Amino acid sequence: MTAHARARRCPLFAETFDKAASTDDRSVSRPRAALHRAAPALALFAAARLTGMVVVALWAWHIGRSPRALLATSWDSKWYVGIAANGYGRTVYWPDGAVQSDLAFFPLYPGLIRAVTSVVPVTGGTAGLVLSWVAAGAAAWGVYAVVERLHGRRLATLTVLLWGLLPHAVVLSMAYTEPLLTAFAAWSLYALVTGRWLWAGALAGLAGLTRPNGIAVAAAVCAVAGCELWRRRGTKGGRAAVWAAAALAPAGWLGYVLWVGARKGDVLGGYFAVQSGWTSRFDLGLGSLKVIRSMVTAPTFFGFPMALVIAGVGVLLFALFVLDRPPLALLVYTGVLVLITVGGSGFFESKPRFLLPAFPLLLPLAAALTRARPRAAITVIAALAGLSFCYGTYLTVAPTAL
């Protein structure tokens, strides 16, 4: 019985594969061979995102806007560039009493922007764009690697293409943190399903320094590590790396949250107070229900009902994903992302963006397309492309946050 077969029969421990894998499995660890296999998927992803950027550029020129400004300095991008240039310390006080601090933004991405601008003569916005594009490519490769490992090349290629054609996929071409988080998450999950514990923990730690919902990666690593330690109870060898991964995984997220708390004078609650200033808190979806009710009773911007539809589809896909009995690592990672998105309040229109790193949600759709007739599959992909390019362009100029 192959390692893949054992994983499917025992999904709880699907992340741990037999070290005596086949030659084809071992070749996955060879970067050149792995990149060669992923090349068609990466080419499709690049084509999708380049087309999306061309559409954004054409519309920007049509309305007298700068394409670069839309992609590099919109909404959150301005905050990241500001942190990169001046460090933390900016606070905005609004007439309604809201207090928004730049401490809500995690440090790794602006730190990388600062590193690039210190050695290359480019602006922070340009550096942020380049970093996002590189991270998006690395993320697409990581998504391919995970899905290929579990389901084969055809499904992996379709998943990468679908990820590049999501309604909010324009964010993957902007100076935002979702590409970087997804890159760390995908490769951490790949390290988990191939038994590379230290890599899994280290990458999860970096994910936790990238975005608040990066804690989902740490949750996956710790859950799998806990199961592995339970499986190895009573044995003496091979446990140190598992413990190390479990310790490394949440270190980035916890370190930043505690640092913000110390800076605000409340070690445990300071960071969450900062998030409250942005109306972001976990309230089990009560805030979202209020927004949905207001959409029924009063006019609203187009992005709000679209966010509701996309988030609803995401929840449905998660249910289908769970029914397929996925590996524990993917189940926990995706479940935590969905829980944070659905249960959090604030910035309702941004919920689809928060789900962008949850690429395993696309597995049920990709599997359905592999079983569909070619004409039907092409029609679905073309429709998704049209929606992605048009809605993505709208998002870059919309009066509401991405």
Specify the residue positions occupied by each region the protein language model found.
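Transmembrane-helix signature of polytopic, membrane-embedded enzymes
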Residues: 123-127, 143-165, 332
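Loop-to-helix entry region of an early transmembrane alpha helix in multi-pass inner-membrane enzymes
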Residues: 107, 111, 119-138, 302-308
